[in-house]
Amino acid sequence: MANFYKDNSELKFQFSHPLMEKIVTLKEDNFKDFGKYDYAPANVEDAIDSYDKVMEIIGEICGDVLAPNAEQVDHDGPVCENGRITYAAGTQQNHDALTQAGVYGLSLPREYGGLNFSMVPYVMAAELVSRADAGFANIWGLQDCAETLHEFASKEIKEEFLPRINKGDTCSMDLTEPDAGSDLQAVMLKATWDEEKQMWLLNGVKRFITNGDAEIKLVLARSEEGTTDGRGLSYFVYDKAWGGVTVRRIENKLGIKGSPTAELVFKNAPAKLVGDRKLGLIKYVMSLMNGARLGVGAQSVGVSEAAYREALKYAHERFQYKKAIVNFPAVYEMLAVMKAKLQASRALLYETTRFVDVYKAYNAIADERKLTPEERQDNKKYSKYADMFTPMLKMMASEYANQNAYDAIQVHGGSGFMKEYPVERIYRDARILTIYEGTSQLQTVAAIRYVTNGSYLAKIKEYEAMEVKPEFAALKEKLVAMTAQFETACEAVQDKGEEYIDFHARRLVEMAAHIIMSYLLIIDAQSCDAFARSAEVYTNKAQAWNNERASYIASFSLENLAAFAAIKDEFVAEEN
């Protein structure tokens, strides 16, 4: 029997992080549920033990059910008939197994049937599911919608929907439209208040909706007549049982084929308002998207793990010139870099998740009582860290997942191009990761302000101030030099206009990420030898990557920008 949690000691290691004691204590609000609910922990150790046991259950289901089903699900896919979607048989089996195990609603309060887990084990579960089947991870991960309802909906709506989600009712977040993709301010699906029926009615079309035929939908719609911007949008919850929504078609996709992506038609579909009018995009969707981006970070790490394991396994099994190909420097370098990127992504994932955990726990406590001045200050700090690290995580982890999937095929050679091996599916599944929930380019837009205002640099200096063991001193010296190089690169783009900064934004964000991820690997390696080799490999690679970026920025001028900008005036010639 395979267990995707027990076969990877790096996961359980995350529960030993020093910040976990604070996270668990805040999440459990000093363990007030103990004695009130079955299985509510009495202390930090009790809570961590529960996390560990549930991860074992999920790991076993991933290894024994989800992963064996993945190839057939990819082949079969969902079917759309008569305006409804039917999952592939394996997808339904996956969903049933996780529902019966009671692992939906991991992070929701116990009063609604959840387990009240912190975000760290929830994200870990998402990583496990993604390693098994990245497509199914979308269906399972859309329980994130419950977090939004819990945070912003009325008590009545919470009581109506949250217990159902915890029991396995599926969700979707219906945001994008044919003319509103990344630019959600352009959403035009109309929400109209019906005085006679005393309800909201939704009319219009949604496109590229993951798990589009879900039982429970969160829908972004235009409630304010005559508006054209984000301030006219509100957020609604819809129950499939109420009728009024049909599936026009499902998309024929490159990858994640088990996850149905649908175009939907709303015709007088009844819905309930979530929170306040006009805050749909500027508050509620932004919160949901941050959670979704964290989820894609976990999905990316899971895909990276799957790609690396397949490549390593094949490299040991495949013999050429009378020896396993893992013995050739060209191959073992590739594998070492794959592992370093994987472990660096995982380090950034859980660092980001810990920041999210702390500020979310404080926000939950603030709903019950007034925070002390010290708590408010702490909350502000971790909220800023979460905002800084989330776009960096989403960009870096998804890009590395694509690179690792690409290299996994390369290790397999011609065999990797064939469907007999899972790496071609992993490669196809990985491609969406840099696109949905905000492209890598949009993550750069979100992250660059933390470069220009010095926030990343300040955090790097915090890591720099930490003591390291003698064996890591040389690596730290390299990072100190790389930090000075990063400062110089930042100064080089100042006072040259917004377009110039935007042009170099990705290079600058990546430079910061390489330094941060190197430090995180060194920090992990201080207490776990499993990270030591990757800390060395990644830091040395990061130095080379940053040298290239710094050199390009230093030799670039405003005049050089014109050669790139000229492409705006080119068009593809078409025959009449």
Where do the language-model regions lie?
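N-terminal leader/propeptide and maturation segments of large enzyme subunits in energy/redox metabolism
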Residues: 17-61, 148-154, 331-349, 355-377, ...
